[in-house]
Amino acid sequence: MKTYLQLLEHILQHGVEKSDRTGTGTLSVFGYQMRFDLAKGFPLVTTKKLHTRSIVHELLWFLRGDTNISYLKENGVTIWDEWADNNGDLGPVYGKQWRSWPTADGGTIDQLSDVVQQIKSNPDSRRLIVSAWNVGELDKMALMPCHALFQFYVANNKLSCQLYQRSADVFLGVPFNIASYSLLTHMVAQQCNLDVAEFIWTGGDCHLYLNHLEQAQTQLTREPLPLPSLAIKRKPASLFDYAYEDFEFVNYQSHPAIKAPIAV
């Protein structure tokens, strides 16, 4: 994961200090890309320990089309707590847009089901896209989508995925996003009887919050460890039937966790 450390270093060296919605302040750069060969290991950051339970359960929660944090709370995941209302609701965030994008005639579109079918029936399509950026519902969301749009690509019987992340909290959020979309790529590949190729992360406003700079510098002093591999223990009937127990990150070794405050 030297690629990720290079992003931290790039922001520390070239970032411009900017104000932000949370009032915390950031060092920011605009436009950055990282590529991960999924055949060479699963891209979990090793220079600090990641909470893999949160990564897996959050993705399963998205795939359910869920927008209430009760499922996350039941499974010990607290990463969305700060944005939920008193009933645990977040408004029409990722899961709603992925699974039930509203149409003008009152219907809905299951973007994920559609894209899986397209990959199976027309893998050379250039329209293998899922978007969470629904302009008509942004004002109803507790947090507008940071990871806004992703696209699949099939070549040589291998599946790649590229994510566009408009706003990237590089210390806390991006390691989760890399792992989450890499996991999704593995799952979709299994459902479509494909091997995995690359996960490509493209960021817009890539920033370190000013109260994360010391933590980022600490992380840069640590030597990356070998990447783990991902084992998926069964192939369920659909993309939406996976369970937490189906996944194992084999030989995940890491340096200790580094705590940092979240900007709300």
UniProtKB/Swiss-Prot annotation:
Belongs to the thymidylate synthase family. Bacterial-type ThyA subfamily. Homodimer. This is Thymidylate synthase. The lineage of its organism: Bacteria, Pseudomonadati, Pseudomonadota, Gammaproteobacteria, Legionellales. Gene3D superfamilies: Thymidylate synthase/dCMP hydroxymethylase domain (3.30.572.10). Signal peptide: none annotated. GO terms for biological process: dTMP biosynthetic process; dTTP biosynthetic process; methylation. Its EC number is 2.1.1.45. Pfam families: Thymidylat_synt. InterPro entries: Thymidate_synth/dCMP_Mease (IPR045097), Thymidate_synth/dCMP_Mease_dom (IPR023451), Thymidate_synth/dCMP_Mease_sf (IPR036926), Thymidylate_synthase (IPR000398), Thymidylate_synthase_AS (IPR020940). Catalyzes the reductive methylation of 2'-deoxyuridine-5'-monophosphate (dUMP) to 2'-deoxythymidine-5'-monophosphate (dTMP) while utilizing 5,10-methylenetetrahydrofolate (mTHF) as the methyl donor and reductant in the reaction, yielding dihydrofolate (DHF) as a by-product. This enzymatic reaction provides an intracellular de novo source of dTMP, an essential precursor for DNA biosynthesis. Pathway: Pyrimidine metabolism; dTTP biosynthesis. It comes from Legionella pneumophila (strain Lens). PANTHER family: THYMIDYLATE SYNTHASE (PTHR11548:SF9), THYMIDYLATE SYNTHASE 1 (PTHR11548). It is found in: Cytoplasm. The active site is at residue 146.
